[in-house]
């Protein structure tokens, strides 16, 4: 079946979403056009409003509708702690823990094969943020992937010798998890990152 130009454009636009392939995009497009036009229009309006109204916080670079995000605008937060994350979703995840320090949001992780070097992900801006701040500890909360580990290692080397405490988030056995269900790599990290019981 050959789709009209407008339907093809809608399908291709839906394919930019993560995890949405050709067939899923076709189903979504046809469902919106056949069964839920008002929902489709509502989606289009919300998408337009978000694309026009959401930018980046000038201080931490997370997504924000204001010049400063709520975390950066809050004077009660701990100015001595800086948590470095890969993206805005990571800020949301860390916020759920009750963390009360400041953030810096990279634009992903180092990935030379994808052309993502230090400048592309914002390392110079991170250096400026640290230089201009009063931080005593930098928490490297990049993802526990090969690229996330490489990014954390690169940042740690860059910041070494600046009088900062550099820490890495722990990773390993999930709370409530059973050892027999944990993969070998995760268990190895958990054993390497063990801590004494006081």
UniProtKB/Swiss-Prot annotation:
The keyword DNA repair applies. This is Recombination protein RecR. Belongs to the RecR family. It comes from the Bacteria. A zinc finger (C4-type) spans 57-72. May play a role in DNA repair. It seems to be involved in an RecBC-independent recombinational process of DNA repair. It may act with RecF and RecO. GO terms for biological process: DNA recombination; DNA repair. Keywords: DNA damage, DNA recombination, DNA repair, Metal-binding, Zinc, Zinc-finger. PROSITE patterns: RECR, TOPRIM. GO terms for molecular function: DNA binding; zinc ion binding. CDD domains: TOPRIM_recR. It comes from Pseudomonas aeruginosa (strain UCBPP-PA14). Residues 80-174 form the Toprim domain. HAMAP family: RecR.
């Amino acid at each position: 079946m050959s789709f009209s130009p407008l339907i093809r454009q809608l399908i291709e636009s839906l394919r930019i979403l993560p995890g949405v392939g050709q067939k899923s995009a076709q189903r979504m497009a046809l469902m919106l056009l056949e069964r839920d036009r008002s929902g489709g229009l509502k989606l289009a309006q919300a998408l337009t409003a978000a694309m026009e109204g959401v930018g980046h916080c000038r201080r931490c670079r997370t997504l924000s509708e204001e010049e400063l995000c709520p975390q950066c605008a809050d004077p009660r937060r701990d100015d001595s702690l800086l948590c470095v994350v890969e993206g805005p979703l990571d800020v949301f995840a860390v916020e759920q823990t009750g963390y009360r320090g400041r953030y810096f949001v990279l634009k992903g992780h180092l990935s030379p094969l994808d052309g993502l070097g230090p400048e592309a992900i914002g390392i110079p801006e991170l250096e400026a943020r640290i230089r201009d701040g009063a931080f005593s500890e930098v928490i490297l909360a990049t993802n526990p992937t090969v690229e996330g580990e490489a990014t954390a290692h690169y940042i740690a080397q860059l910041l070494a010798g600046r009088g900062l405490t550099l820490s890495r988030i722990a990773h390993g056995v999930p709370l409530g998890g059973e050892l027999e269900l944990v993969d070998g790599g995760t268990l190895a990290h958990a054993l390497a990152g063990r801590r004494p019981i006081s």
